[in-house]
Amino acid sequence: MQEDSIEASTSISQLLRESYLAETRHRGDNERSRAEPSSNPFHFSGPGAAEGGGPEDLPDLSAFLSQEELDESVNLARLAINHDPLERVDEAQARKRLSSDQTKHASKPSFEPAFHQDSSRGPASPKDSPPETKRPQYSSETQSKKVFLNKAADFIEELSSLFKAHSSKRIRPRACKNHKSKTESQNKVLQENSPTFSDLTERRERASVPIPIPADSRDNELNHAIEQREAKRREAELAAGEAAAGDSTPGSSPSSLYYEEPLGQPPRFTQKLRSREVPEGSRVQLDCIVVGIPPPQVRWYCEGKELENSPDIHIVQAGNLHSLTIAEAFEEDTGRYSCFASNIYGTDSTSAEIYIEGVSSSDSEGDPNKEEMNRIQKPNEVSSPPTTSAAIPPAAEAQPLAAQPRVSTVQQCQSPTNYLQGLNGKPIIAAPVFTKMLQNLSASEGQLVVFECRVKGAPSPKVEWYREGTLIEDSPDFRILQKKPRSMAEPEEICTLVIAEVFSEDSGCFTCTASNKYGTVSSIAQLDVRGNEDISDNGALHSANSTTNPAVAEHQPSPLNPQPLSEEQPPKPKLEGVLVNHNEPRSSSRIGLRVHFNLPEDDKDMEASSGSGAANTSQTRPNSFPERFNGQEARIPEPSSPIKEPPPVLAKPKLDSTQLQQLHNQVLLEQQQLQNTSPSSPKESLHMSALNSAPPAVTISSKQVKGPAPQMFNLARPKHFFPASSTSTATVSPSSSPVFTLSNTPQTIQRTVSKESLLMAHPSTQGRSPGGLSIQNEPAPPSPAEPAAPPTAAYSIPSGNQFQPHCVSPTPVSPTGRIQNPVAFLSSVLPSLPSIPPTNAMGLPKSAPSVPSQGLMKKTTKAPQAVSDDYIRETKNSVILDLGKKVNFGDVRSHQQEYKISSFEQRLMNEIEFRLERTPVDESDDEIEHDEIPTGKCIAPIFDKRLKHFRVTEGSPVTFTCKIVGIPVPKVYWFKDGKQISKRNEHCKMRREGDGTCSLHIESTHGDDDGNYTIMAANPQGRISCSGHLMVQGLPIRSRLSPALSHRGRSRMQERDKEPLQERFFRPHFLQAPGDMVAHEGRLCRLDCKVSGLPPPELTWLLNGQPVLPDASHKMLVRETGVHSLLIDPLTQRDAGTYTCVATNKTGQNSFSLELTVVAKEVKKAPVILEKLQNSGVPEGHPVRLEGRVIGMPPPVFYWKKDNETIPFTRERISMHQDTTGYVCLLIQPAKKSDAGWYTLSAKNEAGIVSCTARLDIYAQWHQQIPTPISIRPSGSRYGSLTSKGLDIFSAFSSVESTMLYSCTSRSVVESDEL
C-alpha cells in the first residue's frame, strides 16, 4: 500500500512539473491574475479528496514549494485555528462556492505555482520504482492530469491567500508569535525519517481557517506581495532546472521536509474565579489558574470593559497563576469580572460577581462630586452596552455594529435556576412574593435616587425594571443590582435600581416585576423630581452675552406645550421641543427652561402633586385658556431646534434715572388703584404675577452674570427648620417674562419664609397697602469692587386670582424663595411697628422728591437711626418671637408636616431594617398568637401605608402612623434606633386599630426623642419593616440675632464675610448603635456606632461612668464611612461593665449605653505527674500493677506504650484503669515472661504533654522456692504447743489478721521477714 502511494506521488510530481513548464510560457496572464488579491478565505477541499487524495498526497507539495514556504504554511494554518468561530458559518458557504468555481476553472489557476525539486525524489531509487501494474488506475491520462492539477491549484491558491494574510498588518496574539519563532528554530534540526508527520500536517492544514485580509490593507500591500512572489518564482525556476537534470539521491524520504512537534493544548482554567462580597474600602483579589500549550494570553474585563494595569488595579502573573487586585474597592467597582485566556488552539474564560458592600445592603452609590467632575470633563462620552465576550479578534471588530449581539439587562438580572431544598430534601417551589415593596420617592434634580425592594421565590425569580411601561436596561445612569440570597434561611433577594442623577424627565411610575414559572408579581412606586431650587447668585447662571427683545417675543405664533412621557420612550429620552441641551454636561442642563403657567384651574392639580419644579413635565397648560398680560395674549416662542443652546437666564438689568422715574410713577398709580378697591385679607389671596414690561432690549454682560446679582439675597434656609412643602416655583420663559405664582394658602407664606431673611439688613422703610402687600428692598452703597444697583420694582399682591399685572420688572425671582424680601413681607403680616414712619410705594419717605438722586438715597437709609438701637433690637426680637409662635401654630394647625430625608439616610435606615428583621426580638406587645404550623392561606405582612419622616419643634406632639395587612394578623414590634420600645413605656404610646392601622404617639417631644423609629410586622410567612425619622429641633433664636443688627451702610463684602454664620446645626443622633454584648476573655472586642450631626460631633466612651482612655489595649478608630469603633484587645475581666458613648457638638449631645459581659477564659494547665511509675518485678503467672497519678486541666488523655509501641485497649490480659483524681493503672493478669520490658505512660491535653517510664521484670517460678535451711523454720512451731493444749490462738486476732496467718502457713517464712 505504501509503494502504491509513493508511485502515485511520483506520477503527480511529474505531471505537475510538466504543467509548470507549460505555464511559464504564459507569464503575462499569470502576472494579471497575481495582481488580484484573494478576498475570501476558504478551506482546501479539492474535488479529488474522495478519490484517493488522502494524506499521502501532501508530500507532492515539495515539488512546487520551497522548504521555507512549507514551514510557513504550516505555521499560518495553525494561526488560522484561532480564528473567530462566528465567521466560520459564513466562510463555509463561501468555501462551497469557491470550491465549485475552482473546479470549473482549475485548468487556469490564478496563481503561478512555484516548483522545488527535492533531491530525494526521482526514479533512480529502486524503492521508489515499484512495478507499473501497482499504480492506481484512472480512466485516461488527461483526466488524471486534470484531477491532480485542480488539487494542486486549489491548495496553492489557499497557501497564497495565507501568505498575503500573513504579510498584512494584522495584530496577532503574542502566543502565536512565540510559537512561530519556536517552530522556526525546530525546523533547523530536521531529521530524515518521520513518515507520520506528513499525514498529521495535512490534516492540520486542511482543518485550518485562513485569516481574512482587511479591505483597507490589501491595496497597500499588493505591490509588496507581487515583489515577493516574483522573487520566489525565480528561485522556483532555478530549482526546476536542477530537477530537469534528473538529479536524485537514493535513500531520502519525502517526509524529510517535516519535523514532528508535540501537540498543543487549548487554554483551560483549573482554578476559576469565585464570587464574593467585600466591604467598601477593603482590598479585593481575584485569582485563577490557567494551563495551555503554548502558554495562553490572559485579559481581564469588568462588565465587558477591558482592564489594564493602573494604580488602582494591579494585574499580576506568576506562572500559571493570574491575579487581579483592586487596592481599595468602592461601590462603583461592583460588577461581573471576567478573565479570558487564548492561544492558537482555543480560548477559555471564567467569570465572577464582585459585590462591594457599602453602608447599605443594596446600594450602588457613587461619589456625586466625582461623578459631577467626570461629567464636566467628559460631556460627550457615550456609554456602550457591555459585550459578552472579549475574545473578538481584530478582524471581527471591523464588522458593522449591527452584527454584534446586544446584551440586554434581562440577562444580567436573571437569577440562578437552582432550587432551594427543604428539610426533606425536596425542592421548595413558590411563586415570587415581595417581602418589601417599593416606596414612593421625591427628590430634587441632580440627586441620587435608590429604589429598593426584596423578593423571594423558588426557583429564584427573574427581575425586570420598567419606567412607564418601558423596560430599563442597565447603564451608567440606571444601575440595576440584584443581591442573591445568602442562605436558605434568608431566601429573599434584594433588588435595587440606582439612578445616579435624576432629572425632571425621570419623574413617573417605576415598576419592579419578579417572575418565575409559578407566577409573577409587581411592585410600583412613584418618583417625583422637583425642579432645581439651588440656583443662587454666586455665578450659577450658565448663559451670558445675550440680547432679548420682549416685544418681539410676544408675537411668536405658537406656544410651547411640553409633551408628557409615553410608554414607548426610552428611560432617558431627549424630549422634543424642550430647551435643554443634552450635549452639555448634565450639571449645566439642570436649569430647566420649559415654561409652565399656573392657572386658577390648575391650583387643585398643583396641590395634589407632590412636587413641581422648573422642568416638571407632569403638568401642561390647557390650550383653550389664553393668558393675557396687559390685554394681549401671551405667546411663547418655540425653540428652533431641540438641541439648541438654552436661552440666557436674565439677571437684573441696570436702570437709569428715567426708567426709575417711570417705574416710580407706575407703582404709585397702581397703589392708588388698590386703595380704591375693597380691602381683603392677605390670607384670602396671595397670587402674584409680575411681568411683561422691560426695556426694549436688555443686554447682559458677562460680568453681570458671573458676579452676584446686587439685589438677590441668599435665602438658602436650613431645610430642617421650617416644614417643607410642595409649592410652585417661578419659571422663566425664553422671552424673559417670568411668571411668579404663589400657592393660595397662608401655610405657603409661612413655609416660604427663610430664616436667613432675618440675617439681612433691616430695610429703611416698609409700606403696606390696604388691599395687598407691597414688598421692596433697597440696595446698599456700592462697594469698590461692584457698581451700585438701583432698587427693585415692587411686587404687589392683589386681591383675587387675576392674571393682571400690578408691577413691572424683568428680574426673575430667586428660585430659593417666592418673595424677594421676606423681612418686608413679614412686617406686613405681623403687627406693624409704630416707630416706622410712613413711606410711599418706592420705600422712600413721602416727602422725598419724585426723582431721588443717589445722595438722597444714601441719606434716607439712615432715617431709622433716629430711633434708639435698643428699641430696634427689642422690636425685632418681638417680631422674631412672634414669627416663631406663628410657625409653631402653623405646624400644630396642619398637624405634622413630613419632610424628605436624603437618599443616604434612607439607605442607612434600610440597613437597620435589614438587620432588625434577622435579629431575635422580645415578645410582641400584641395579644396575638400564631400557630407553629400555619394552616390555610397565608400572606406575608405588607405595608398598605408606611411611616413618614417628621420634623417638629421641642415640646410638640408627634404621631407615627402606618397600616399593615397580612394573614394571619401580624405581630407588631416598635424600635427606636434599633432598640425595642416596651409597651410599658409611658412616653411612647402604641396603638393598634382593627383595620391594621398602627400608631406611635409622643405627646411632648424632647431632644432624646430624636432618631429613627422602626416598626416591624411578623407572621409565620415572613417579616417586614419600615422606618421613619423624627428630628426634634429647638429654637436657638437669640444666638442668631447678631447679624440682624448690621447697618444697611455696610458693604456687600462684609455681608459675604458673615455668611458662615448661616451654617446649619444639627443635634447629634445615632444612626447605628450596638446592643448588649457578650465577649470572651482574651479575645478582640469591637463596639461600633454611627452618629450624625452638624458640626460633626465628638465621641467620648465611658465605662461605669469613668472615661475610657486610649492605651495599648483600648483604641478609638473612625472609618471613612463615619463608623466610630472602640477596640479592646485583649479583653480582660476588668473591661466588663456598662459602656456609654456620648456624642457632643455645639447644639447638644446624645448618648447610648450597653452592657458588656466578659466570659471567663478557660483555665488550661499542662499535665503534671504527681506519682511516677515504679520499677517492679513479679514471678511469672502473678498479676502486676503499674500505677501513677497525673493531673491537668482539662483532664488529660492517657496513652500506654511498651518498648515504644502503643498498647491497644483490646489486648488480652491487659486492662487500663483511671479515675477522676488522676490515678491511672495498667493491670497485667497473669504476667508472662513476654510482658517484661520498658513501659511508658503519656498524659496529653490542650496545654501540653508529659510522660514517665518504668521497667517491669518477670521472674521464673522456681526462683522463689529454693530452700535455705539456716534462715527457714516451720511457720507453725511457735503456736503448736499452745494449740495442742486446747488454746485457740487465731480467735484472738481479727479476721484480716487471721487470714494473713492462714495464708502464711502455706509457705515457709524467712526469719528476717518475721523480725
Swiss-Prot record:
Residues 23-35, 84-104 have a biased composition (Basic and acidic residues). One of its GO terms (biological process) is sarcomere organization. Its main location: cytoplasm. Gene3D superfamilies: Immunoglobulins. Keywords: Actin-binding, Coiled coil, Cytoplasm, Disulfide bond, Immunoglobulin domain, Nucleus, Phosphoprotein, Repeat. It holds the Pfam family I-set. Residues 166-180 have a biased composition (Basic residues). GO terms for cellular component: cytosol; I band; nucleoplasm; Z disc. Residues 184-199, 609-623 have a biased composition (Polar residues). GO terms for molecular function: actin binding; muscle alpha-actinin binding; SH3 domain binding. SUPFAM superfamilies: Immunoglobulin. Transmembrane segments: none annotated. Disulfide bonds join C288-C339, C453-C512, C1089-C1141. Residues 19-60, 81-145, 166-204, 230-266, 359-392, 535-652, 674-704, 725-747, 762-814, 840-865 are annotated as: Disordered. Residues 267-357, 432-528, 941-1025, 1068-1157, 1167-1257 form the Ig-like domain. The keyword Phosphoprotein applies. Residues 779-790 have a biased composition (Pro residues). The modification Phosphothreonine is found at T249. Interacts with TTN/titin, NEB, NEBL, ACTN2 and CARP. Belongs to the myotilin/palladin family. Component of the sarcomere that tethers together nebulin (skeletal muscle) and nebulette (cardiac muscle) to alpha-actinin, at the Z lines. This is Myopalladin. It comes from Mus musculus (Mouse).
